[in-house]
């Protein structure tokens, strides 16, 4: 694995370069190509987020529910896109249980 010298995050290969989510890029040299190989390609899949009331153990934050106007919601982060993209922030209203998401 290659780590970003700027922010310390894991860098991912893309288009002949290692790319970091912070924007740093490093060319993949022939020496590095010999060091790494792709062992498996995985396709993105949909996931079920919650199936019960287990959300009640999550932290809360002050944010307005777009459905009922309540000013408190549970929140959590989940990787829903490619690994080199930022996580998605989910909210669930503490009053009406409406769930919505925010992308960075």
From Swiss-Prot:
Where do the zinc-finger regions (C4-type) map? Answer: 4-22
Residues that coordinate or bind Zn(2+) 1? 4, 7, 20, 22
Q: Which residues bind Zn(2+) 2?
A: 65, 68, 93, 96
GO cellular component terms?
A: DNA-directed RNA polymerase complex
- The molecule here is called Transcription factor S
For biological process, the GO terms are: DNA-templated transcription; regulation of DNA-templated transcription
Which SMART domains does its entry note?
RPOL9 (SM00661), ZnF_C2C2 (SM00440)
Tell me which residue ranges form TFIIS-type zinc fingers. 61-101
Q: Which family does it belong to?
A: Belongs to the archaeal RpoM/eukaryotic RPA12/RPB9/RPC11 RNA polymerase family.
Q: What does this protein do?
A: Induces RNA cleavage activity in the RNA polymerase. In its presence, the cleavage activity of the RNA polymerase truncates the RNA back to position +15 in a stepwise manner by releasing mainly dinucleotides from the 3'-end of the nascent RNA. The truncated RNAs are able to continue elongation. Involved in transcriptional proofreading and fidelity. Misincorporation of nucleotides during elongation of transcription leads to arrested elongation complexes which are rescued by TFS-promoted removal of a dinucleotide from the 3'-end.
Species of the source = Methanothermobacter thermautotrophicus (strain ATCC 29096 / DSM 1053 / JCM 10044 / NBRC 100330 / Delta H) (Methanobacterium thermoautotrophicum)
């Amino acid at each position: 694995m290659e780590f970003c010298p700027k922010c310390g995050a894991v860098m991912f290969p893309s288009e002949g370069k290692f790319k970091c989510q912070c924007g740093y890029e490093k060319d993949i040299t022939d020496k590095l190509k010999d060091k790494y190989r792709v062992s498996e390609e995985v396709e993105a899949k949909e996931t079920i987020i919650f199936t019960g009331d287990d959300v009640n153990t999550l932290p809360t934050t002050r944010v307005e529910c777009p459905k009922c106007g309540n000013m408190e919601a549970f929140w959590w982060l989940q990787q829903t896109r490619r690994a080199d993209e930022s996580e998605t922030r989910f909210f669930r209203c503490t009053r009406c249980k409406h769930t919505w998401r925010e992308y960075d």
